[in-house]
Amino acid sequence: MTVIVLSGPIGAGKSSLTGILSKYLGTKPFYESVDDNPVLPLFYADPKKYAFLLQVYFLNTRFHSIKNALTQDNNVLDRSIYEDALFFQMNADIGRATSEEVDTYYELLHNMMGELDRMPKKNPDLLVHINVSYDTMIKRIKKRGRPYEQLSYDSTLEDYYKRLLRYYKPWYEKYDYSPKMVIDGDKYDFMSSEADREIVLDQIVDKLKEVGKLPMDWDKSTDIQIEA
């Protein structure tokens, strides 16, 4: 059985690819809930006040998601606990968290990762990272249409988004919980183009074959013309 986790910045297309990939492989998608997150709008309205609360909220939900996914062992997750510290550390670096909040956050994360390490299946089987440029990121954020994510909502978001993209390169290089691969989200518009979608799916299947984690009962005849 196979557990795949996705990563990538806001607007990269993680949720769309999660749905496409889970249907293609016949596995269960795990989506991070955003629209009913009570803290996220508060964070965008007052980032310094709510950065710690938001990250603890996400950390808790991501912990439960990865535990369930590793237990069921047949899933695709659109974001995971392995990516969590990237966001909090970035907010801490720009003064949105106190030293006490930083210490508390990392203690919580350490305890949760320790619990995962005691599970029968400890890690995912593959990380699929979607790499996008700033322009692609903003284009998809506009298309998604969440008001509090738009540049017009807050003039500081441009710097925040550009900084976030810079944090991803070292994070990906250091990630070592599983095999990993990169999808070029600028080159392949898997959300709108069926041809690009097929290329991306083929890339992921090839990687799963390489690491010996392609589901044994997978049928390549599965229709990939999925509405993302």
Curated annotation (Swiss-Prot):
What molecular function does GO assign, one term? ATP binding
Q: Which residues form the active site?
A: 78 (proton acceptor)
Give the main EC class. Answer: transferase
Query: Per UniProt, where does substrate bind?
Result: 32, 44, 55, 79, 84, 149
Classification via Gene3D superfamilies: P-loop containing nucleotide triphosphate hydrolases (3.40.50.300)
> Which reaction equation describes what this protein catalyses?
2'-deoxyguanosine + ATP = dGMP + ADP + H(+)
Keywords for this protein: ATP-binding, Kinase, Nucleotide-binding, Transferase
Q: Name one GO cellular component term.
A: cytoplasm
Cystine pairings recorded for this chain: none
Show the CDD domains listed in the entry: dNK
Supply the EC number(s).
2.7.1.113
Residues that hold ATP according to the record: 8-16
Say what the protein does: DGK/DAK plays an essential role in generating the deoxyribonucleotide precursors, dGTP and dATP, for DNA metabolism.
Family listed: Belongs to the DCK/DGK family.
Assembly description: Heterodimer of a deoxyadenosine (DAK) and a deoxyguanosine kinase (DGK).
- What name does the UniProt record give this protein? Deoxyguanosine kinase
